Amino acid sequence: MENKIEGVAIGIDLGTTYSCVGVWLHDRVEVIANDQGNRTTPSYVAFTETERLIGDSAKNQVAMNPDNTVFDAKRLIGRRFQDPAVQEDVKPFPFKVICKDGDKPAVEVKYKGETKIFAPEEISSMVLLKMKEIAESFLGKEVKNAVITVPAYFNDSQRQATKDAGAITGLNVLRIINEPTAAAIAYGLDKKTSGSKSERNVLIFDLGGGTFDVSLLTIEEGIFEVKATAGDTHLGGEDFDSRLVNFFVSEFKRKYKKDVTSNARSLRRLRTACERAKRTLSSGTQTTVEIDSLIDGIDYYASITRAKFEELCMDLFRGTSEPVEKVLRDSKISKSEIHDVVLVGGSTRIPKVQQLLIDYFNGKELCKNINPDEAVAYGAAVQAAILAGDTSEKMDLLLLDVSPLSLGLETAGGVMTVLIKRNTTIPTKKTQVFSTYADNQPGVLIQVFEGERSRTKDNNILGKFELTGIPPAPRGVPQIEVTFDIDANGILNVSASDKSTGKSNKITITNDKGRLSKEEIERMVEEAEKYKTEDEKLDKKLEAKNSLENYAYNIRNTVRDEKLKEKIQEEDKKSIEEKVKEVLEFIETNEDLEKEEYEEKEKELKNFANPIISKLYQQGSVPDMGNFSTGQNEQDDNANMGPKIEEVG
């Protein structure tokens, strides 16, 4: 690192369904729990008439507000709207996905009575903001730096879009790293503490909520070298949920002649029940789905066995072996040479997935000594600390990752000429000389593609640019040097120069189809700040409202205290009761006032109650009542805002 990073750096596993954050502290990784006490947080953002919710609170209200609760942004990020996978995904989404700016997906929601449109990067940035806040509340200070993980099989535009999401949140993204590689760090450090030093071939099998990756690494003396990677950015636990949902939808239709899919709220409730059933079936062999008044007042009760669930998903489960075979083939390592098969991602808890893997590796025991939900964030936290300049001996490691897809350009006849083969260690730089196809050709169009097919039309175009001003010459004479340069984030820069004139042009693959422009990112940063300020304002308002309510109840409880029956005059008691009743009615009828108005009301109540409470104090009659303001020895009424209550995590 050329310059040491200011402040602490965190590692964020930005998942399709759940996210997780960790930090290196006191020579170890802390995976941080959120305000609900959970170490993973749903990647959900909800918009209501009054507020924006992120995480558990958003997921908990999804059945009540399906149209405006956004999830699965990771399945949209960096993709084209017309991408068949995106079209397939949006079908069951209860929220609206629209096409914006050419061919980019965006979500449309109602927020505070207005229609708002958000890019997937913005939704992801809100989840990242939540993870950042979880870390800040644990560390007690602001966090600016982060390492964010992506599936190993994410392409260039998906990586770039994830980096943009970090920028919108106001994070300095030190590095984008691959999820299985991050998990391998967690595995490697665990092995290190158990004293293993010899070279190990490790297969990371990472099946999460929405993506699937397999990576094969060799680990020796702190060097983590990725040999090959493969996967499916479109397979995970949600696909298994969908199979259950489809099964119960058809069962319900058969039994009651009603279509659950016609009602977004009913469908959401069914999906939540199916997700719960799937989890239960990982430990039990049978479970029931029970939903009161699912649709048209019909209570739905149905049982499902593990065997039936396995049958419904068997093709998906079996499909997980293909990437495993591919990495073994690409790395030229046989399955008998694999020392450990490491399970990562919540979906690896499914017994059938484990059994198929055991069978594939001829009965080999699977490595389960790292937490599948937390391993990725754990590894990201270690990498963040290293990049921030932490020199702890415990994490003396070097990471050698690879580019997941072949990269090249189009040459005559639509041929894909590969400059960087898949599974090349990154960062890397490759240069090749090309020439013109026609006599006196004044310029060349450089079209950059990624993929494994021999024709560019079957691969994914990343971007294009022109190199013009080539002096007239017969075909094949000009020498055009093209350089592909991949940085440590897996993001590609391409440059071309004419050797005779020295004229050059370059492009950072900003993927005109999927990437946000600098101006768009700046606008989104401003909007993110605005939403954050609104959230904070609402929090302060609720705090003032709760403070007033608590104070009113405490005053009333005090004058009703049996012990004070003899001490307090009946007319004082009556006047306090009336005043408190008036205040509580005021709160009930004024749900949405400004913070200052609630504070003013509390001040008014204190001024009213203080003389009476002071009398009781002077008689020595008042028991210890927490944060009471009596006006005595107090410089400022606002210095004591009534009783505070701690939220229990």
UniProtKB/Swiss-Prot annotation:
What Pfam families does the record point to?
Answer: HSP70 (PF00012)
> Which CDD domains does the UniProt record give?
ASKHA_NBD_HSP70_HSPA1 (cd10233)
Which InterPro entries does this entry report, sorted A to Z?
ATPase_NBD (IPR043129), Heat_shock_70_CS (IPR018181), HSP70_C_sf (IPR029048), HSP70_peptide-bd_sf (IPR029047), Hsp_70_fam (IPR013126)
User: Where are stretches of biased composition, namely Polar residues?
Assistant: 620-633
Task: Show the segment(s) annotated as Disordered.
Answer: 620-649
Instruction: State one molecular function term (GO).
Output: ATP-dependent protein folding chaperone
Name the source's superkingdom: Eukaryota
- What are the UniProt keywords, alphabetically? ATP-binding, Nucleotide-binding, Stress response
Keyword rRNA processing found:
no
Q: Does the keyword Transcription regulation apply?
A: no
* PANTHER family hit by this protein: HEAT SHOCK PROTEIN 70KDA (PTHR19375)
NCBIfam families associated with the record: PRK00290.1
Q: Which family does it belong to?
A: Belongs to the heat shock protein 70 family.
Annotated protein name in UniProt? Heat shock 70 kDa protein
Whose protein is this, by species?
Pyrenomonas salina
Give the gene that encodes this protein: HSP70
